[in-house]
Regions:
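Membrane-embedded helix bundles of polyisoprenyl
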Residues: 2-13, 19-64, 70-107, 121-128, ...
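Membrane-interface helix-loop junctions at the exits of transmembrane helices
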Residues: 20-40, 130-141, 162-174, 241-281, ...
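Membrane-interfacial entry segments at the cytosolic side of transmembrane helices
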Residues: 69-73, 109-124, 228-241, 307-319
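Hydrophobic alpha-helical membrane-interfacial segments at the cytosolic entry of transmembrane helices
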Residues: 81, 104, 111-135, 146-151, ...
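Perimembrane helix-loop-helix junctions
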Residues: 94-126, 210-227
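Signature aromatic-anchored transmembrane alpha helix within multi-pass, membrane-resident enzymes
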Residues: 101, 122, 126, 298, ...
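Periplasmic/ER-lumenal interhelical loops and adjacent helix-loop junctions
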Residues: 127-214
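Extracytoplasmic
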Residues: 328-454
Length: 454
C-alpha cells in the first residue's frame, strides 16, 4: 500500500495524468526485489522509504507559501525520513543519503540555494542519531562491523539478471529459475543474492521502446540521435548530472570492493583497515543497487510520459505493465506457500519439559549459540511459559557482554548459587559444570540441569 502511494506521488511529479500514475505505480508495487524480500526479510521490503528519499529530491523545487517554510520544511522532512529509516532498517539510511547527495547538487547548481542542503544534512544526521540512541543502539559496546564485505555485493549484471535458487540466492526466490518467466538466470558469485536488483522485462522493454522511439523521432526530424540527446541534456543538464552522480556512487558501493561480471572478477579494491571496518557496518553492499534500480524505473517512466500522443503513451505503458506482470508472475506464485496456514510443532516433544519448567521465570541457555534453530526453539518455549531468556537472535550481538554473562552464570552455578527460578538448558554435556547433587535430564538433544537449591 505504501509502495503504491509513494510511487504514485513520485510519478505525479513529472506526469499529472491520473491513469498514467496509477498504472506506472504497478512497477514499484511488484518490484522483483520487494517480492524477493517478502516473508523472508520483511523490513527490507519496505521500499517506500527509498521512494520517499527520491520524492524529497524530485520535489525540492516545491513552492512553499511562507518564507520560513522555504528554508526549513525540507530539512524537517529529511530529518523525519531519517527517523523513519532507522526505525525500520538501518540499511535504508545510506540509500537516503544518496538521494540527499543529488539534492545537494541540484540545490546548489540549479536553484542556487546554498544553506538548505546543509540544513538537510544536519537534520537527517542529528535526528537519525537521536532515534538510534532512543532505540538503544549505543547501549552496548557491540562491534557493528561484521564479516562478509565483498561477498554480499551486487553483480554488474544485476539489473537484467533474474537469478536462480541453486546457491546463488540462498533459495530466496523459491523454485529454480523462478525470478523471471522469460529470461534465464545468469551465474553470479556466491552471496550476490543480496545484490539482487532485477528490473523486470517490462522495464527493459520500456527502455528499448524509448530507444526505438528516439531513433524514429530523429529520422523524422532529419536530425541525428546525438543532436536530440544533446538538446535534452542541455535542458536538463543539472538533473542529468545529479542523477548520474547518484547512480554512480550507489552502484560503485554496491559492487565494491570486489567487482564481478557474471562469475568473472573484474577488479579488487584494497581499502585501509579503517575504511573496511566502516564499510563492514553495511557489509551487504549489494543492497545499494536498489538506488540504481529505482532510478532506472523512474527514468523509463519519465521517458514514456514524454510521448506526446496520450493514447499511445497509456497503451505503451499498459503493454509494458502486462509484460512485467507476466515476467514476475513466477516470483509472485512462489510466495503462495506463505498464504497457507502453518502449524508450529515444537521439537521439544518430551513431557518432562513441562514438569521441569514449573516455577521458573527465566530460561538460561548455555553456552551462547547463534544457530537460529536453537535460538527460536528455546525462545518460543520460553515465551509460551512466560519466561525471559538470556539471549536472542540479533544482527550485531554484543559478544563481549554475552561472554561475560556466560562466565558469570557458570561461576554462580559452580559456587552453588544457581538461580532457583531459572531453567538451565545446556547445548552439550561437556559444558555442564560438575556440581554435587546436580540432576541432568537429556531431553530432545538438549541437557536440562537442576542444581541443588532449585
Amino acid at each position: 500500500m505504501m509502495n503504491g502511494a509513494c510511487s504514485t506521488l513520485l510519478i505525479h511529479r513529472f506526469n499529472k495524468n491520473g491513469i498514467f500514475c496509477i498504472i506506472g505505480s504497478t512497477f514499484y508495487i511488484i518490484s522483483p526485489v520487494v517480492l524477493q524480500r517478502l516473508y523472508g526479510h520483511e523490513a527490507l521490503s519496505c521500499h517506500f522509504v527509498i521512494l520517499l528519499g527520491l520524492i524529497l529530491w524530485l520535489y525540492q523545487d516545491h513552492k512553499w507559501k511562507k518564507k520560513w517554510q522555504e528554508i526549513f520544511m525540507m530539512p524537517i522532512l529529511w530529518g523525519l525520513l531519517g527517523i523513519l529509516a532507522v526505525s525500520i532498517h538501518i540499511y535504508y539510511l545510506p540509500m537516503i543519503y544518496c538521494f540527499l547527495l543529488g539534492c545537494f547538487i541540484t540545490d546548489v547548481f540549479k536553484y542556487k540555494k546554498y544553506l538548505r542542503p546543509f540544513l538537510c544534512l544536519i537534520s537527517i544526521t542529528a535526528l537519525s542519531l537521536l532515534m538510534l540512541w532512543m532505540l538503544g543502539a549505543f547501549y552496548t559496546k557491540t562491534n557493528v562491523a561484521a564479516q562478509g564485505l565483498g561477498i554480499y555485493s551486487a553483480n554488474i549484471n544485476t539489473f537484467w539478471n533474474p537469478l536462480d535458487s541453486q546457491g546463488s540466492n540462498n533459495g530466496l526466490l523459491g523454485d529454480v529459475s523462478k525470478g523471471s518467466r522469460f529470461l534465464k538466470p545468469i551465474a553470479v558469485n556466491f552471496g550476490q543474492y543480496e545484490g539482487y536488483a532485477y528490473v523486470g522485462l517490462g522495464i527493459i522493454l520500456g527502455a528499448i521502446i524509448l530507444l526505438i522511439a528516439s531513433v524514429c523521432r530523429s529520422i523524422k526530424r532529419q536530425k541525428r540521435l546525438t543532436s536530440d540527446i544533446r538538446e535534452f541534456l542541455k535542458n536538463k543538464k543539472v538533473w542529468c548530472i545529479a542523477g548520474a552522480v547518484v547512480f554512480a556512487v550507489a552502484m560503485f558501493y554496491a559492487i565494491s570492493p570486489s567487482a564481478y561480471f557474471n562469475e568473472k572478477k573484474i577488479y579488487d579494491i584494497y581499502y585501509s583497515e579503517r575504511i573496511i571496518k566502516f564499510m563492514s557496518s553495511f557489509r551487504a553492499t549489494g543492497r545499494y543497487a536498489w538506488v540504481g534500480m529505482y532510478l532506472i524505473f523512474t527514468a523509463v517512466l519519465y521517458g514514456l510520459s514524454r510521448i506526446s500522443r496520450k493514447k499511445l503513451m497509456i497503451s505503451l505503458l499498459a503493454f509494458c505493465t502486462v509484460v512485467q506482470f507476466a515476467d514476475v508472475s513466477c516470483l509472485m506464485s512462489s510466495r503462495k506457500w506463505f498464504k497457507e496456514e502453518k502449524t508450529y510443532t515444537s521439537p521439544l516433544a518430551s513431557p518432562a519439559w513441562e514438569q521441569l519448567a514449573e516455577g521458573c521465570d527465566k530460561l538460561i541457555g548455555l553456552p551462547y549459540d547463534q544457530s537460529q534453530a536453537t535460538i527460536y526453539t528455546l525462545s518460543i518455549f520460553a515465551y509460551k511459559h512466560n519466561m525471559s531468556i538470556n539471549h536472542f537472535h540479533v544482527a550485531r550481538p554484543p559478544f563481549d557482554d554475552i561472554l561475560n554473562q556466560y562466565y558469570k552464570n557458570m561461576e554462580q552455578i559452580s559456587n552453588g548459587n544457581a538461580d532457583p527460578k531459572a531453567l538451565y538448558v545446556f547445548l552439550s554435556e561437556e559444558f555442564i559444570p560438575e556440581v554435587e547433587g546436580a540432576k541432568v535430564y537429556e531431553l530432545d538433544g538438549y541437557y536440562v540441569v537442576k542444581f541443588p537449591g532449585q
